């Protein structure tokens, strides 16, 4: 409902703007020189992509929750889905995807986020504690702690992705 603190039109505009920003980030993330250390650079890119997929899922969820509805023929519709950045010359006049396709899109993004993020951002005390999915990126605890350790607390993590999936 409309209130002084809740404007559904702003949510539509702001939500799609956020998704556009995430899509642009995902296209550019591998080009960014995050650090001179190659292992850290790759692990940062992995983490930041995971956070981006999680944020895209979150914004898609909020848009779907607030703007899904039934068509004239009774089909439950979601929102238009964009998984790549659209330039100013793109056709933004896209039909709404089905509600099912929107939920699947959210789950797919959450799957990617969970694969790229730690359950929680905590330091480890030795190399044997590096989660298996991050071992291709680094074998050093210092690198893992720098990127996935306690400095990352309060960021989107796999636990948040699981919580969003449960909603």
Which ranges hold each PLM region?
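Conserved, well-structured interaction surfaces
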Residues: 1-69, 92-101, 110-120
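Short glycine/proline-rich turn/loop motifs
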Residues: 1-6, 86-91, 141-146
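Outer-membrane beta-barrel proteins
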Residues: 12-13, 36-40, 143-159
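Well-ordered alpha-helical segments within folded domains of soluble proteins
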Residues: 18-26, 81-84, 159-164
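Short, flexible, mixed-charge acidic loops at enzyme active sites
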Residues: 70-85
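Aromatic-residue-lined binding/catalytic grooves and analogous aromatic/hydrophobic interfacial grooves
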Residues: 110-125, 131-134, 154, 158-167
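Acidic, Ser/Thr- and Gly/Pro-rich intrinsically disordered linkers and low-complexity segments
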Residues: 127-149
């Amino acid at each position: 409902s409309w209130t002084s603190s809740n404007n559904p039109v702003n949510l539509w505009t702001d939500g799609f703007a956020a998704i556009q920003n995430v899509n642009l980030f995902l296209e550019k993330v591998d080009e960014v020189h995050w650090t001179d250390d190659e292992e850290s650079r790759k692990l940062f890119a992995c983490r930041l992509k995971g956070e981006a997929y999680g944020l895209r899922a979150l914004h898609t969820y909020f848009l779907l929750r607030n703007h899904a509805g039934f068509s004239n023929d009774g089909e439950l519709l979601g929102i238009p889905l964009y998984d790549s950045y659209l330039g100013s010359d793109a056709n933004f006049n896209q039909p709404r995807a089905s509600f099912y396709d929107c939920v699947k899109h959210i789950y797919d993004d959450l799957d990617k986020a969970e694969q790229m993020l730690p359950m929680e951002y905590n330091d480890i005390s030795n190399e044997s504690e590096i989660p298996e999915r991050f071992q291709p990126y680094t074998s050093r605890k210092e690198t893992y702690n720098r990127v996935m350790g306690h400095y990352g607390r309060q960021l989107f993590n796999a636990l948040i992705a699981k919580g969003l999936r449960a909603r």
